[in-house]
């Protein structure tokens, strides 16, 4: 699986390092040194400051927690039971593809980590169901349906750019202020886009399943029941396995989340939705759903592996942003966009450029750190709606996830599929998504 991915592109870490070198080379030729003879040292200093920029490191941890805790929720018993109940309606490829796509997109609009793992587990359960009941199933198409949530997540409640700019003290506040999610995620433009995606994508996958209704489960899905080996719990271990303690702790978190959102404020507002608030709520839900700390921590140990990319790559992107800001490249690129754009074309150019950047920077948070300053500077110069510009970037970032295999790795591991098997179908989702997103950007 990893070998196949690296045949398409280098590892995301290698790409981040290469982008760092490219940024340095461009900055050396484009930027004027403030101290003669020390230009390289100045660039290295700005890079080092960017690596460990405190607000950006907080942002990285917030995104990492959002992925991990969302993954933990997806591994809980209630989610597993829900998937099993829905699976009984998946009797052929067309129905299965439509049902998985709808629920995966719906869940991903709430949390991208949850949507990613939910879709992967759902796809595998449907494959196991087909084998058990001797049903014909195009398993790669089902895998693609389980990955569809990654083309809608940035327009959802956990979208990196929209939730970050809704938080006081974000790193671009001095250029754009704090923008509520009522102007981004819950804007009429994005609500229309989300509704269209929820309707069109499942319908499209249904007819795609009708057209490609072939029996293609070429991998070995173990459907045998695993024997549960009971272990005698003694002494202080009882604390780790205590349902009461997990329910109380998780319940207190959920109670205060509700109290903070609906009781404390004089007016209920979407401003409450910040990265910290989302993670706080997810933590409470995860603790309650796993019923004890032992199960919760076991799920965390499983989920944390998927967050390694955020942990090690985000600082490199922050360093790139530091060099670009110091060297004046942000202003240069912004001026370029201003010169070739107008009020109508700027959101489209933003969407397309974000899609291209996402191929090389497969992280919404990392991309926002690098491209966000350029987009906001250009939008300010053109006097164009900043919320719309942010959403155009979000749409572009998420759509090319259907081409970029980085975030598909957890799904490929869970389903046993290869990237080359799901790619023919995710490319079709990519094309449908472009039509939807460009249309709403032009309408509004």
Model-derived segments and spans:
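Membrane-interfacial loop-to-helix junctions in multi-pass transporters
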Residues: 11, 52-60, 87-99, 132-141, ...
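Alpha-helical transmembrane segments of multi-pass membrane proteins
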Residues: 94-108, 133-157, 177, 181-182, ...
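Cytoplasmic juxtamembrane regions at transmembrane-helix boundaries
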Residues: 74-99, 210-231, 310, 317, ...
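Membrane-core helix-loop-helix motifs of multi-pass transport proteins
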Residues: 123-215, 408-440
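Early transmembrane hairpin of solute transport permeases
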Residues: 50, 54-56, 61-168, 360
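Hydrophobic alpha-helical transmembrane segments of multi-pass integral membrane proteins
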Residues: 89-122, 311-327, 338-377, 394
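Hydrophobic alpha-helical membrane-insertion segments
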Residues: 12-27, 140-163, 313-317
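Hydrophobic transmembrane alpha-helices of multi-pass small-molecule transporters
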Residues: 1-65, 186-199, 203-309, 313, ...
């Amino acid at each position: 699986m990893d070998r196949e991915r690296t045949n398409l592109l280098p590892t995301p870490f290698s790409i981040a390092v290469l982008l760092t070198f490219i940024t340095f080379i461009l900055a050396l030729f484009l930027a004027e040194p403030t101290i003669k003879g020390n230009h390289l040292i100045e660039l290295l200093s700005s890079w080092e400051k960017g690596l460990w920029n405190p607000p950006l490191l907080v942002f990285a941890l917030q995104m990492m927690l959002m992925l991990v805790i969302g993954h933990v929720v997806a591994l809980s018993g209630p989610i597993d039971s829900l998937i099993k109940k829905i699976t009984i309606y998946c009797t052929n490829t067309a129905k299965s593809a439509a049902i998985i796509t709808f629920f995966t997109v719906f869940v991903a609009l709430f949390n991208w980590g949850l949507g990613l793992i939910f879709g992967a587990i759902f796809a595998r359960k449907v494959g196991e169901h087909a084998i058990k009941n001797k049903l014909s199933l195009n398993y790669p198409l089902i895998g693609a349906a389980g990955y569809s949530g990654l083309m809608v997540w940035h327009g959802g409640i956990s979208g990196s750019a929209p939730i970050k700019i809704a938080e006081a003290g974000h790193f671009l506040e001095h250029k754009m202020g704090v923008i509520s999610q009522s102007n981004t995620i819950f804007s009429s433009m994005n609500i229309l886009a989300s509704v269209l995606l929820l309707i069109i994508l499942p319908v499209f996958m249904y007819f795609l399943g009708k057209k490609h209704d072939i029996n293609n489960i070429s991998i070995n899905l173990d459907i045998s029941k695993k024997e549960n080996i009971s272990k005698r719990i003694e002494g202080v271990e009882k604390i780790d396995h205590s349902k009461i303690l997990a329910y109380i702790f998780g319940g207190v978190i959920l109670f205060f989340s509700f109290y903070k959102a609906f009781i404390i404020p004089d007016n209920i507002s979407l401003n409450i939705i910040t990265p910290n608030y989302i993670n706080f709520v997810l933590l409470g839900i995860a603790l309650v759903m796993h019923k004890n700390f032992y199960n919760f921590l076991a799920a965390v140990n499983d989920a944390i592996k998927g967050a390694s990319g955020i942990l090690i790559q985000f600082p490199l992107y922050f360093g790139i942003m530091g060099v670009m800001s110091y060297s004046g490249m942000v202003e240069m690129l912004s001026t370029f966009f201003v010169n070739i754009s107008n009020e109508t074309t700027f959101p489209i150019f933003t969407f397309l450029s974000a899609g291209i950047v996402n191929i090389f920077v497969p992280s919404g948070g990392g991309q926002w750190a690098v491209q966000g300053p350029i987009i906001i500077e250009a939008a300010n110069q053109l006097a164009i709606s900043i919320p719309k510009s942010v959403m155009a970037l979000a749409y572009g970032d998420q759509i090319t996830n259907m081409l970029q295999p980085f975030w598909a790795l957890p799904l490929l591991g869970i389903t046993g599929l290869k990237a080359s098997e799901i790619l023919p179908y995710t490319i079709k989702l990519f094309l449908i998504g472009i039509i939807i997103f460009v249309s709403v950007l032009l309408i509004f």
